């Protein structure tokens, strides 16, 4: 094959990346994401593998951030188990499912509780034990907006 390629006799050579999915798949399983999303998705009876759709979109956002449409195109250059038959509208449905508001809004903060919150709570419960200690909290501040007087030299 290599000799034919060097001679210019190979009609088509295609490559697909294996690394991103291979590395992240193990983390996905070890953290319990696969099981938690699979359990929650099983309650809804989707006609496609919702867990694989969520995995694909998360993997895409980690390695090449973009829209769900971009994720659908991006996946063709990778080897990812279980995503070959997924269609764009199924990726949209998977993301919509994560944003579905829950009927039980107890413990609600500033925003309505969604399926995403259930996933986070169940993942935390898997790792939480008698000896767990919450010593570090990460906050996503990418969408925060501050307004006020002063602070003109803060970013310099």
Residue ranges of model-derived segments:
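Dynamic "connector" segments at or just before major functional cores
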Residues: 1-155
């Amino acid at each position: 094959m290599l000799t034919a390629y060097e001679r210019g006799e190979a009609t088509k050579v295609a490559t697909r990346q294996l690394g991103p999915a291979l590395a992240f798949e193990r983390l996905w399983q070890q953290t319990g994401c696969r099981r938690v999303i699979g359990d929650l998705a099983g309650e809804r009876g989707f006609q496609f593998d919702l867990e694989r759709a969520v995995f694909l979109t998360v993997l895409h956002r980690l390695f090449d951030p973009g829209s769900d449409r971009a994720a659908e195109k991006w996946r063709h250059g990778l080897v990812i188990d279980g995503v070959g038959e997924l269609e764009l509208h199924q990726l949209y449905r998977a993301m919509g499912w994560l944003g579905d508001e829950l009927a039980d809004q107890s413990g609600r903060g500033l925003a309505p509780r969604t399926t995403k919150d259930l996933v986070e709570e169940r993942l935390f419960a898997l790792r939480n034990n008698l000896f767990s200690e919450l010593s570090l909290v990460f906050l996503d501040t990418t969408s925060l907006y501050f307004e006020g007087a002063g602070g003109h030299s803060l970013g310099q």
